[in-house]
Amino acid sequence: MTLDNYNIFNDEYLFGMPLSPLPKVLGTFDGIQLAPTLTTPTLTPTTTRSLQEAFFELTNDPGTPYQATFKPPPLGLMPGGNNGNGVTNVPTTTATATVVGVVNPMISQLPYEVNSALQGTDSDNSNASWADAQNNEDQDTTDTSSAHTDSTSYQNGHMAGSSVNGGGANNFTNVLAGINAGRGSTQGSNTNTSNSATPARRGGGRRPNRNTNMSPEEEEKRRIRRERNKQAAARCRKRRVDQTNELTYEVEQLEKKRDGLKKEMETLTDVKNQLEFFLRAHHSSCQKIRTDLLSVTTCNGLIAPVGLPSAGSCDSGSSSHHNNNSNDSSNGTITGLDASLNSTGRSNSPLDLKPQIKDEPLDGGLDSSCLLDQDGPPPSKRFPLPPMSTLMTPTGVSSGSLQTPIASTAPGGFGSAYPITTTKGSMNSPTLNELNKPKERPNTLAVQRPFVPQMHLNLTSNHNKMPGSGPTHIQGVPIQTPTTGFNFDSLMDGGTGLTPVSGPLVPSQNKHPLELPTPTAEPSKLVSL
């Protein structure tokens, strides 16, 4: 087929016939041109079979050729129409030759009929070659080395009739005949090349090439290698299963150990709680703890060791003879200290805890029987009061009394509104005493001296009483309350300069309620600095 014939074929079959099924068929072939040349991609058994099936399906469509209710007559081979190239020219009828763009539906019969006219071929041999090629394709899935054989088949003159000058229909039948001829010659060349050398693999995957022409030694090697692989895989699976079982057993043992530890912790916690409960219940009635808390053995003001015997100057039993509430540093026991001081850790180096306690004279009016027990809390300390003459300003009156004088009448503010009957029977007679008279502003400050044994207060004496002081005896029994003879200034080492220096209020005799002294009855006497 020349270039002119190729152009004519393209114009007639590809572009001039829109209803023809051939453009669809020829357009789906990957890289296959109509007229094979030296640069044309070669045909393989797979593409040849797909081409044959496509032609068979498209030409056997019953609806396409008979749309115009016209059935062309069948074409037959003419006996004398050989052109010398081994290809018979098929004469066409008048209808098919004169009508442009109509394809004869019986053209599908031409490949099988043309093959019978080829030199040295037969239709039975062609069918057998197709079956053999198909079987060869099933056996060798990776054999794609038919390019050389196909190209040589075209060069050997199997398609010599392609250069015949003729009509478009006759040229197309020649092309189909050449395709079948190339398909028939492919089988013999493929068998020769497969026997000569194993083709290279062009596909991926683990599946090796079919061992159709493999030597027995190679087959034995492959079998041995396959058996070894199977054994290695089985050993690997067994080792993995063994490791899994071992780890599972170890996990079970650890879980059991954890459960045992949890139970042991719970048991120990219960025992601890029970012991703590017993300790709390016994703490209130434990005599040893009470003894350790209340007494610590001392020797010359030092805490003695635990095993030191009390002898000589370290007489711990002499504390029972001293009920004067004084802690002697040379003998006796120190009460109220913590029992932790009497520990073995401090026995080698006792602490020098020598308390400095002031000498406190006893109160003459207090009986020793009123003191609390030695085990109880210590009684409150009592201090003697100095004479009030050192604290009072010289106003010309007796100032040694601690009692506050009581006014015989109410203040002037009350006397103007309410008539008050005094003991003398006179109405609104202001009986002036020393507290109601105006007093001078003091210009000196009395400082209290330290406590001296001579500065004792005798509550039963009468030389420092004022005329209006209250009684200190009730039916011969002295009043011994904590507030008797005390005020705030007597508890300090001197006046603060801001507190009144008058004596404390003492309950008076049966007086009128309006005659009782009030905070506003007299001006406060402040000491100026």
From Swiss-Prot:
Region named Basic motif: 221-240
Localization in the cell: Nucleus
Domain bZIP as annotated: residue spans: 219-282
Task performed by this protein: Developmentally regulated transcription factor AP-1 binds and recognizes the enhancer DNA sequence: 5'-TGA[CG]TCA-3'. May play a role in the function or determination of a particular subset of cells in the developing embryo. Is able to carry out its function either independently of or in conjunction with Jra.
Assembly with partners or alone: Homodimer. Heterodimer with Jra. The kay-Jra heterodimer binds more stably to the AP-1 site than either of the two proteins alone.
Record-stated family: Belongs to the bZIP family. Fos subfamily.
Name used for this protein in its record: Transcription factor kayak
